[in-house]
From Swiss-Prot:
Record PTM text: Predicted to be exported by the Tat system. The position of the signal peptide cleavage has not been experimentally proven.
Name assigned to this protein: Deferrochelatase
Pfam families: Dyp_perox_C, Dyp_perox_N
Entry GO CC: cytosol; periplasmic space
GO molecular function, a single term: peroxidase activity
Cofactor: heme b
Family indicated by similarity: Belongs to the DyP-type peroxidase family. EfeB subfamily.
Residue ranges crossing the lipid bilayer per the database entry: none
Record note on quaternary structure: Homodimer. Part of a ferrous iron transporter composed of EfeU, EfeO and EfeB.
Organism: Escherichia coli O6:K15:H31 (strain 536 / UPEC)
NCBIfam families linked: Dyp_perox_fam, tat_substr_1
Swiss-Prot/TrEMBL GO biological process terms: iron import into cell
């Protein structure tokens, strides 16, 4: 394991190596033009979740306010594009692939069996939308000297540095771009990733990948049921209402009054943290201690001393923390003061399970993702309040990064990142 230092790893040499590999892959791939001949879609398809779809065009990207789907993947890439024109080609191509994959259609037929197939085939002859969303974000490193974009970097975007409890693996950190791919089923998520990689061999190289999940019944509730994390507690109870457009404008979206570059309006700062849980240790911890650490009842999700999950804790009547400890997770994360109102963020986390670590412990945890209009006021402020909390004994952040989720695609003539690249 290579640990991340404050200055990061040597990126230019890595990119030069990957560009050579990508060029070889492109030389052996099939031209996209061969996809003109396609199979006909089946005449009937059972009216189930496979036909569910999210709008692709709009002011904002899907996958941020969208109710959480059951399956999720985070994939960070190094960009191999050599100049700004190449980067535009990449963003146009990604937009085309996202538009097709999220809306569904017939899988392309391979015109010559001696050539590689144009589709992986894992979804069969018809690619159902399956509630797929693909959200594109850009990292701090995309605004280096390669594309001349430095003056247009979002003002609060920065490289993720280590917090006191972090044990960051350099191989699991950062990225020029990040895809958050979500759908009702895992095979749709995997199909989307393979399609994107197949179409961009000379433009993208995978840097790191993690797959996550929430329970099917939580996903089917469309946000009405809070997912439970692998520590056994509800995760996201205190989220602001994503259906409240006025509130989301205040919490999630960058707006014109923030003195950000004009192209960022309608986008959102994204914080990603890969957090490993010490589940064996946690499972041997008394229930009372677990609940004290979180500040919530494990079964109901209610704040301690209250009855219902969404009851608002009354910290003013508990100044000494006799009911909800002063260092409990919920009290530190959101002390519910006038000052903490500005640090609200929209969480969209998923559990992960990867097997076992080198020490023989279960490799399980949380893919923490949150969106906010200001990274410093949102995630960074909250995380600083959480430094030293009792929960740190059971969790260990090992990777992730800070990104900016691009504004949406207006129509079929537009593409992701167009306002950025046209400056």
């Amino acid at each position: 394991m290579q640990y991340e230092d404050e200055n990061g790893v040597n990126e230019p040499s890595r990119r030069r190596l990957l560009k050579g590999i990508g060029a070889l892959a492109l030389a052996g791939s099939c031209p996209v033009a061969h996809a003109q001949k396609t199979q006909s879609a089946p005449g009937t398809l059972s009216p189930d979740a496979r036909n569910e779809k999210q709008p692709f065009y709009g002011e904002h990207q899907a996958g941020i306010l969208t109710p959480q789907q059951a399956a999720m993947m985070l994939v960070a890439f190094d960009v191999l594009a050599s100049d700004k024109a190449d980067l535009e080609r990449l963003f146009r191509l990604l937009t085309q692939r996202f538009a097709f994959l999220t809306q569904g259609g017939a899988a392309p037929e391979t015109p010559n069996p001696r050539l590689p197939p144009l589709d992986s085939g894992i979804l069969g002859g018809y690619i159902a939308p399956d509630n797929l969303t693909i959200t594109l974000s850009v990292g701090h490193s995309l605004f280096d000297e390669r594309f001349g974009l430095a003056p247009q970097m979002p003002k609060k975007l920065q490289k993720m540095t280590r917090f006191p409890n972090d044990s960051l693996d350099a191989a699991l950190c950062h990225g020029d771009v990040l895809l958050q791919i979500c759908a009702n089923t895992q095979d749709t998520v995997i199909h989307a990733l393979r399609d994107i990689i197949k179409h961009t061999p000379d433009l993208l190289s995978v840097r790191w990948k993690r797959e996550g999940f929430i329970s099917d019944h939580a996903a089917r509730s469309k946000g009405k049921e809070t997912p439970i994390n692998l520590l056994g507690f509800k995760d996201g109870t205190a989220n602001p209402d994503s259906q409240n457009a006025k509130l989301m404008q205040k919490v999630v979206w960058v707006t014109a009054d923030q003195q950000e570059p004009a192209w960022t309006i309608g986008g959102s700062y994204q914080a990603v943290r890969l957090i490993q849980f010490r589940v064996e240790f946690w499972d041997r911890t008394p229930l009372k201690e677990q609940q004290t650490i979180f500040g919530r009842d494990k079964q109901t999700g209610a704040p301690l001393g209250m009855l219902h999950e969404h009851d608002v804790p009354d910290y003013a009547s508990d100044p000494e923390g006799k009911v909800i400890a002063l260092d409990s997770h919920i009290r530190l994360a959101n002390p519910r003061t006038a000052e903490s109102e500005s640090s609200l963020m929209l969480r969209r986390g998923y559990s992960y399970s990867l097997g076992v670590t080198n020490s023989g412990q279960l490799d399980m945890g949380l893919l923490f993702v949150c969106y906010q209009h200001d990274l410093e006021k949102g995630f960074l402020t909250v995380q600083k309040r959480l430094n030293g909390e009792a929960l740190e004994e059971y969790v260990k952040p090992i990777g992730g990064g800070y990104f900016f989720a691009l504004p949406g695609v207006k129509d079929a003539n537009d593409y992701l990142g167009s306002a950025l690249l046209r400056v």
